[in-house]
Structures are given as C-alpha cells and as structure tokens.
C-alpha cells in the first residue's frame, strides 16, 4: 500500500514529461520572436539611459 501513492504520482508525471518533448509549433515561434523583440527594445532603451543620464541629447 505504500507504493500506491508513488505509483499514482509517477503516472501523473508521465504525460507532462511527454508534452515538453514536442516540437515547436508556428505559434511558439511567433511568441519567441515577440519576446526577442521585446527584449531587444528594452536593452536599447536601457543602453540609452546609461549612456548619458543628465544629457539626453548626446545619445
């Protein structure tokens, strides 16, 4: 009887592990490029704020 909870937990984990191994879909690629664009934009604004915080005209 002690093994029954462990067995049930393992059965619940098996389907979730299989979903991780699935190839990316078109939606996943679009979402990844959206995050890349957002990251690139934030980095550009961060670099501008660091270049000369007092004088914004020099950037």
Swiss-Prot record:
Record-linked InterPro entries: T-conotoxin
Location within or outside the cell: Secreted
Keywords: Disulfide bond, Secreted, Signal, Toxin
UniProt GO MF annotations: toxin activity
Disulfide bonds: none
Taxonomic superkingdom: Eukaryota
Post-translational changes noted in the entry: Contains 2 disulfide bonds that can be either 'C1-C3, C2-C4' or 'C1-C4, C2-C3', since these disulfide connectivities have been observed for conotoxins with cysteine framework V (for examples, see AC P0DQQ7 and AC P81755).
Signal in keyword set: yes
Expression sites by tissue: Expressed by the venom duct.
GO cellular component, one term: extracellular region
Record's signal peptide: 1-19
Primary localization class, coarse: secreted
Propeptide stretch(es), residue numbers: 20-47
Domain characteristics, as noted in the entry: The cysteine framework is V (CC-CC).
Family as reported in the entry's similarity comment: Belongs to the conotoxin T superfamily.
Protein name: Conotoxin Ts-03
Native source species: Conus tessulatus (Tessellate cone)
